């Protein structure tokens, strides 16, 4: 089992790192007391091989010897990776002032500046024990996300899931679409009596549409558009992309185009799915 522990000063980016881990398939738990790690791993054994927890100052032991003992008591098959995120006092003070959030130690009747300094002192033992120390003072959320992915995967690229979904406009537009293309202007197999009862998944319909230069040109242009912008979407920490293709009824043209696009992009590094809303609804 792989375990990632994310610690650090409040406001340094622990939540950002945890979101990256969640996107990578980790089962994430925020602010788990260290003595409960063993119990958590035992509960998840066999069902989750990737686990990540974040630990803040409220859950840290006061002595570093206790911390070392707790980490040493992890199950022997645990592959541990640890991060400590830090920022300068000035940057942390600025971030808290901008977000107006309450610092975890502010309840002790101390000022924000004093709470930030106190937290740094309390977390110092942890900062010396971790595998990866990241100063986020000059990093934005995208830079930090890239660093975490680089450490865990050896690459800043994330696996983007692309869903090509066909639909019929007369049944309503999908609300989850990131891109939406209207193919109602393409030649319609519906007017061919032999093709009318078939769908875009059937070979006769596919052959009919494949013979249409306008159809092939449109598919090629969508493919080029997506290939141009996919790297930028990935850099923007996007995990899912839904491309909706709509025709009148969602039976012929949109199904064929969605299938063709899914085939073309399935040869790359992305996870690609084709979903046909109206066909699925007809089966239900």
Curated annotation (Swiss-Prot):
GTP binds at residues 56-59. Keywords: ATP-binding, GTP-binding, Nucleotide-binding. SUPFAM superfamilies: P-loop containing nucleoside triphosphate hydrolases (SSF52540). Disulfide bonds: none annotated. It holds the Pfam family RapZ-like_N. ATP binds at residues 8-15. GO terms for molecular function: ATP binding; GTP binding. Belongs to the RapZ-like family. Displays ATPase and GTPase activities. PANTHER family: RNASE ADAPTER PROTEIN RAPZ. This is Nucleotide-binding protein Shew185_0683.
């Amino acid at each position: 089992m792989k375990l990632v522990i994310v610690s650090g000063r409040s406001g340094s980016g622990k939540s950002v790192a945890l979101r990256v881990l969640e996107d990578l398939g980790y089962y994430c738990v925020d602010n788990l007391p260290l003595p409960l790690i063993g119990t958590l791993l035992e509960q998840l054994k066999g069902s989750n091989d990737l686990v990540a927890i974040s630990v803040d100052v409220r859950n840290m032991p006061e002595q570093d010897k206790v911390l070392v003992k707790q980490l040493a008591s992890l199950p022997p098959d645990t592959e541990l990776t640890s991060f400590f995120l830090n920022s300068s006092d000035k940057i942390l003070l600025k971030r808290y002032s901008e977000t107006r959030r309450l610092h975890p130690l502010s309840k002790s009747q101390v000022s924000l500046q004093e709470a930030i300094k106190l937290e740094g002192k309390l977390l110092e033992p942890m900062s010396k024990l971790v595998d990866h120390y990241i100063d986020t003072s000059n990093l934005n959320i995208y830079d930090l996300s890239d660093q975490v992915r680089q450490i865990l995967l050896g690459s800043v690229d994330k696996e983007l899931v692309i869903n090509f979904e066909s639909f019929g406009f007369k049944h309503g537009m999908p609300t989850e679409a990131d891109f939406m293309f209207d193919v109602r202007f393409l030649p319609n197999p519906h007017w061919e009596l032999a093709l009318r009862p078939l769908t875009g998944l059937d070979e006769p319909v596919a052959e009919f549409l494949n013979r249409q230069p306008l159809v092939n040109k449109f598919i090629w242009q969508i493919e080029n558009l997506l290939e141009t912008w996919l790297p930028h979407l990935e850099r923007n920490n996007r995990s899912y992309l839904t491309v909706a293709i709509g025709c009148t009824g969602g039976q012929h043209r949109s199904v064929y185009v969605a299938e063709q696009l899914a085939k073309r992009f399935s040869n790359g590094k992305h996870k690609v799915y084709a979903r046909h809303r109206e066909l699925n609804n007809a089966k239900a």
